[in-house]
């Protein structure tokens, strides 16, 4: 339902106004509504940290731009666990590292590390 980092939050488009206010006050970040690849539960469709956002591979360019604007980081497309598009279902990431499902392939790991800033 919520995709957030230290700079902003991107949330389910139908989230009630009261919930938006709670997120703004709790996280102290601006909040924008939207979806990714027609997935309204954006926290399932993407994973963010303070360096980047890995998004559902069918996310459209305008959706990526909206996420980049909301979270103030670069967004890219990717998958996990041998092609699963709902990256938030099997990837947890912070600024210091990540944990991903054991079926994730080498190329998928490379995309995760590049997008989320774990490659120097």
Question: Which role does the model predict for each range below?
Answer:
Residues 1-120:
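The feature marks the mature, well-folded catalytic cores of soluble enzymes
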């Amino acid at each position: 339902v919520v995709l957030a980092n230290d700079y902003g939050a991107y949330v389910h488009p139908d989230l009630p106004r009261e919930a938006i206010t709670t997120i703004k006050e709790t996280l102290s970040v601006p909040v924008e509504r939207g979806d990714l690849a027609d997935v309204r539960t954006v926290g399932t469709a993407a994973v963010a940290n303070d360096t980047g956002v890995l998004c559902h591979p069918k996310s459209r360019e305008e959706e990526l731009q909206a996420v980049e604007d909301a979270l103030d980081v670069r967004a890219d497309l990717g998958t996990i666990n041998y092609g699963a598009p709902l990256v938030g279902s099997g990837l947890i990431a912070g600024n210091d590292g990540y944990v991903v499902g054991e079926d994730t392939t080498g190329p998928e790991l490379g995309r995760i590390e590049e997008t989320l800033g774990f490659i120097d």
